[in-house]
Amino acid sequence: NLNTFYVTKNSAPREVFKAKLKIDKMSGLNNLFKGSGSFYDCEQNSFDVLIVDEAHRLNKKSGLFSSLGENQIKEIINASMFSIFFIDENQRVTLKDNGSIEEIKKYARYYNASIYKMNLKSQFRCDGSDGYLAWLDNILEISETANFDLDSKYEFKVFDDPNELRKVIEEKNKINNKSRLVAGYCWDWISEGKNKSDV
């Protein structure tokens, strides 16, 4: 009977969980989810537990014009008796992404909250393949690991032409509809001006 919410900055993860959980016909499903900008005006300890996914994506301020509140991490910690942050600082994708382990620790100390740090051993979206993640960190020089060889389940290629990359991915997708082309988004690319040749 805890007052608990799943919190993310982006609505996409919330919508995926809502769609999956609706299969079980849970009532009041929308009441389990909140956006990260929902806590700027909350009283202290309004919630029992806030589970914050992708905490590295949190912004400093809330609202459409980033004009509400002081700091989303501070506001989440203030609003709940127990806050859980899932964070991977290597997955920040925009200049506004403010979530960091140090920021979380700073505001936890501000509220005299106990801090418990745990490491997840594997990622569901990679079928639990820690070897793949370690290999990727090593090849991209994110961190040095002992994984120099790629598991045979994966194929790794470097392309000089993005159109050729797209073509190969489209061909792979015809096999089992599980191939995607994705890219991080950091800032607007304007078709006029200095970035014109890149768009």
Language-model features and meaning:
Residues N1-K9, N98, E102-I104, Y116, ...:
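Conserved motor-region signature of P-loop NTPase helicases/translocases
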Residues N3-L50:
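Inter-Walker segment of RecA-like/P-loop motor cores
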Residues K9, D88, C186:
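Cofactor-binding loop segments of dinucleotide-utilizing enzymes, especially the Rossmann-like FAD-
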Residues K20-K25, L64-L68, K96-K105, A134-D137, ...:
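Short secondary-structure boundary/capping segments
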Residues N30-G37, D53, A113-F124:
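Conserved beta-strand -> loop -> alpha-helix junction used to position metal-binding or nucleic-acid-contacting
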Residues I51-N119:
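Signature of the SF2 helicase/ATPase Hel1-core->accessory helical subdomain module
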Residues T94-G99, A113-A134, E141-V199:
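Conserved helicase/translocase motor-coupling segment
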